[in-house]
Swiss-Prot record:
Protein name in UniProt: Translation initiation factor IF-2
GO MF term list: GTP binding; GTPase activity; translation initiation factor activity
UniProt organism field: Thermotoga sp. (strain RQ2)
Residue span, tr-type G domain: 178-346
Region (G5): 324-326
Function: One of the essential components for the initiation of protein synthesis. Protects formylmethionyl-tRNA from spontaneous hydrolysis and promotes its binding to the 30S ribosomal subunits. Also involved in the hydrolysis of GTP during the formation of the 70S ribosomal complex.
Presence of the UniProt keyword rRNA-binding in the record: no
Length: 690
């Protein structure tokens, strides 16, 4: 037996690669991933060890001894110890949690620092992960109450439908089953995306009925070693990102096609950035290896240098498969790698109940009326089901598979065409099955009314109104899409923007490219709630219209200094102002007056500065602080005033404090809000050098 990859050894042992990796870790065998090699000797040792473990597991276990009274009592005590507490979102404070779990604050602070290395202070507002660590330390379960919507109008009907599946995924994990992966092929123009899709389709799809296929539905399914893979056959990262922007992720895996004779090109980088933003696994297919000038090693080097993708054989974690879509060389291995990645990522679905699907194409057909091509995500879609989708509803009149053959049911990851919608549904949105056509109609009508009312107020992030969103996060993040006239300009922009990074704010460049601002850039910005900055480039008309429609902020500049200045101003506006205390005056209590129904009033001689009715005061007695708080009333003679300046006398009533004495010293101060400026990387390094 020659050396094997981990996933090949897993097959021999009838295990999943993930299970084998866990077993190897427990055995102390150091392997990086499922693509790592294991030599023959090591493979035999692993097989022997795991087979021995299996034999032991199958042996009947010895009968357990009956528990003694002490053991039973101990178990009862342990069970009693386990508590469950419910917290509201506004109760994530150390003092509240300490009270709820019955552990003193100081004890929690000490335990968390010593045992978990987490520094806390009394009354601190906690992050959710800090709360979880505290409760884990004391073996207490937690449940966070969800904040209720304040009005029916705020509830998105489709969000409620989507939530139904999220709850199923959380509460019924044991019912989830693996489903075939859905794959999107991306890459630079002329690198062979369509040729690859045609090759897979022609060699893997079952023979057609006589007359051939008359209509493509936008996706097809193939079978590989008894397992299915669904391919979306409308390649292009614009479609892929538009789905994400509409909250309808269909793709599980991206195959990035790069030509071996051309290397990494601008659209390759753009496609990669779209896939990366979606956080889906990427497999690289180096195509055209049959060409005389093909250079696979050089292409791999460009993957590292331009995309940061390190092939597994070079010690990285990116699967790279050399192929020829024209001859078919390497295509079978690519399909096997897709199945392997699907298995490693545990792509699952909820197979029962009402179906959920995503629309990949839709149109008005002259003969069939409104039609939609969908990929089923969960459940079973059936003829006769009532459905809703974005702007319309209907009843499934007919279903056609990817060969345009009529079927009665469609299963997860299966591509099908639906007939029966009242209108053409929005492409790239989700489809949900509901209990009846009447209910479907009601949902869509309510949603359309609410969307119309919100139309004017709905918009994406722009440089002026980031404040609200940013205050919700400790680390503030601004996503940027950069377009410039040359790669030199792109490099200069990146360099200038990186100097604006700070501890308080992170500038995340999602994509940077050369050329005019396109619809693809706008859809990416909409998907990541980002801002587009263009340098010496124009915005094409389609992109301009789409940006207005999606509410995406697009800015263009001809001077780099102006771009940087605008960005600086926006970043400064994202920081909350700092509160600074300013002492404004001092005084002394010369006389104490007792007034019925009012209490004690201090007769004060101002020594310097002034006293402000809207400010604060500290009272010192023999050098010790006895009170700090607000001024309830301030009088000059009998007149209510806002300010009294030295050397005048005045009468002061302190809010909630009457224990005053002659000779008490007063210090008056105000709290001012001072505009904060971020400490940019360049300024920080200058300060460190000084």
């Amino acid at each position: 037996m020659a050396r094997l990859r981990v996933y090949e050894l897993a097959r021999k042992l009838n295990m999943s690669p993930k299970e084998l990796l866990q077993e190897l870790e427990e055995l102390g065998v150091n392997v990086k991933s499922h693509m790592s090699y294991v030599d023959e000797e090591m493979a035999n040792i692993i097989i022997d060890l795991l087979e021995e473990d299996n034999r032991k597991a199958k042996q009947p276990s010895k009968p357990k001894k009956e528990k003694g009274e002490e053991e039973v009592e101990k178990e009862v005590v342990e069970k009693k110890k386990k508590k469950k507490i419910t917290l509201k979102p506004d109760e994530l404070k150390l003092d509240i949690i300490a009270e709820k779990i019955g552990v003193p604050q100081n004890k929690i602070i000490q335990d968390m620092f010593v045992k978990r290395g987490i520094a806390l202070r009394p009354g601190q507002i906690l992050k959710l992960e800090e709360v979880e660590q505290i409760l884990k330390e004391y073996k207490i379960e937690i449940e966070i109450e969800e904040e209720q919507q304040t009005s029916v109008e705020e509830v998105d009907e489709f969000e409620l439908l989507e939530k139904r599946y999220q709850e199923l995924y959380e509460k019924e994990k044991d019912k989830l089953v693996p489903r075939p992966p859905v794959v999107t092929v991306m890459g630079h123009v002329d690198h062979g995306k369509t040729t690859l899709l045609d090759r897979i389709r022609s060699t893997r799809v079952a023979e057609r009925e006589e007359g051939g296929i008359t209509q493509s539905i936008g996706a097809y399914q193939v079978e590989v070693n008894g397992k299915k893979i669904t391919f979306i056959d409308t390649p292009g990262h614009e479609l892929f990102t538009e789905m994400r922007a509409r909250g309808a992720q269909a793709t599980d895996i991206v195959v990035l096609v790069v030509a071996a004779d051309d290397g990494v090109m601008p659209q390759t980088i753009e496609a990669y950035n779209h896939a990366k933003a979606a956080n889906v696994p990427i497999i690289v297919a180096i195509n055209k290896i049959d060409k005389p000038n093909a250079n696979v090693e050089k292409t791999k080097q460009e993957l590292v240098e331009k995309l940061g993708l390190i092939p597994e054989e070079w010690g990285g974690d990116t699967i790279v498969v050399p192929i020829s879509a024209r001859t078919g060389q390497g295509v079978d291995e690519l399909l096997e790698m897709i199945l392997l990645v699907a298995e490693m990522n545990e792509i699952k679905c909820y197979p029962e109940g009402p179906a959920r699907a995503v629309i990949i194409e839709s149109k008005l057909d002259k003969k069939m009326g409104p039609v939609a091509s969908v990929i089923v995500k969960d459940g079973v879609l059936k003829v006769g089901d009532a459905v809703v989708a974005s702007n319309t509803y209907g009843k499934v009149r007919n279903l056609f598979d990817d060969n345009m053959r009529p079927i009665r049911e469609a299963y997860p990851s299966q591509p099908v065409m639906i007939l029966g919608f009242e209108d053409v549904p929005d492409v790239h949105s989700n489809v949900y099955v509901v209990e009846s056509v009447e209910k479907a109609k009601e949902i869509v009508e309510k949603r359309l009314q609410r969307l119309e009312a919100q139309k004017q107020s709905r918009k994406h992030i722009n440089l002026e109104d980031l404040m609200k969103m940013m205050q919700e996060k400790e680390k503030k993040v601004l996503n940027l899409i950069l377009k410039a006239d040359t790669y030199g300009s792109v490099a200069a922009l990146k360099n200038a923007i990186n100097k604006l990074q700070s501890k308080e704010i992170e500038l995340n460049i999602v994509h940077a490219g050369v050329g005019e601002i396109s619809t693809s850039d706008v859809m990416l910005a909409a998907a990541v709630d980002g801002v587009i900055l263009g340098f010496r480039v124009k915005v094409n008309n389609q992109a301009r219209r789409l940006a207005e429609q999606e509410g995406v902020d697009v800015r263009t500049y001809s001077i780099i200094y102006k771009l940087v200045e605008d960005l600086k101003l926006a970043l400064e506006g994202m920081l909350e102002p700092e509160e600074v205390e300013e002492v404004i005056g001092h005084g002394e209590i010369r006389k104490v007056f007792k007034i019925s129904k009012v209490g004690k009033v201090a007769g004060v001689q101002m020594l310097d500065g002034k006293a402000d009715r809207n400010g604060f005061v500290r009272i010192y007695r023999n050098g010790q602080l006895v009170f700090e708080g607000k001024i309830e009333s301030l009088k000059h003679y009998k007149e209510d005033v806002n300010v009294v300046e030295a050397p005048q006398e005045c009468g002061i009533k302190f809010a909630g404090f009457d224990d005053i004495q002659e000779g008490d010293e007063l210090e008056f101060y105000v709290i001012r809000k001072v505009k904060r400026k971020p400490t940019f990387v360049e300024e920080q390094s200058d300060q460190e050098q000084k």
